[in-house]
């Protein structure tokens, strides 16, 4: 459960990320594909080379979904319902992949925003990404 302090930390961090969210999303995807090669199996139709347009486009989709979650932090299940349906019923993404991407997002954000990435912000973002992952996997049951 995100505390009021966690919610403030997440919102502040996301504001600091600002217009770079899409770039960071793409970098996190690349990082995930390189660090966890089995995750590539969900993207057989993508050009997975560094800087590909498809990775950039999907990175922006990831970032936009996270921005939506931040903007609806008190109702993430409602805000992410359609995305949860998509990943559970159509794409059938293994839930462990959300944890892997969350880790790669944390690493990417920490590398680009070291001043903002305090231990408290790190913990809050980790809890936030876990909450988003829980929502996205909620319809698997």
UniProtKB/Swiss-Prot annotation:
Q: Please tell me in which tissues this protein is expressed.
A: Red blood cells.
**Locate the Globin domain: which residues?**
1-141
GO MF annotations in UniProt: haptoglobin binding; heme binding; iron ion binding; organic acid binding; oxygen binding; oxygen carrier activity; peroxidase activity
Question: Looking at the keywords, is Cell inner membrane present?
Answer: no
The entry's cellular-component GO terms read: blood microparticle; haptoglobin-hemoglobin complex; hemoglobin complex
Q: Supply the InterPro entries for this chain.
A: Globin, Globin-like_sf, Globin/Proto, Hemoglobin_a-typ, Hemoglobin_oxygen_transport, Hemoglobin_pi
Look up the domain of life of the source.
Answer: Eukaryota
- Binding of heme b, residues: 87
Q: Which UniProt keywords apply?
A: Heme, Iron, Metal-binding, Oxygen transport, Transport
**Pfam families to which the protein is assigned, alphabetical:** Globin
Listed binding positions for O2 are 58
One GO biological process this protein is involved in is: hydrogen peroxide catabolic process
Q: How does it assemble?
A: Heterotetramer of two alpha chains and two beta chains.
* Protein role: Involved in oxygen transport from the lung to the various peripheral tissues.
Q: Which family does it belong to?
A: Belongs to the globin family.
**Name by which UniProt lists this protein:** Hemoglobin subunit alpha-1
Native organism: Varecia variegata (Black-and-white ruffed lemur)
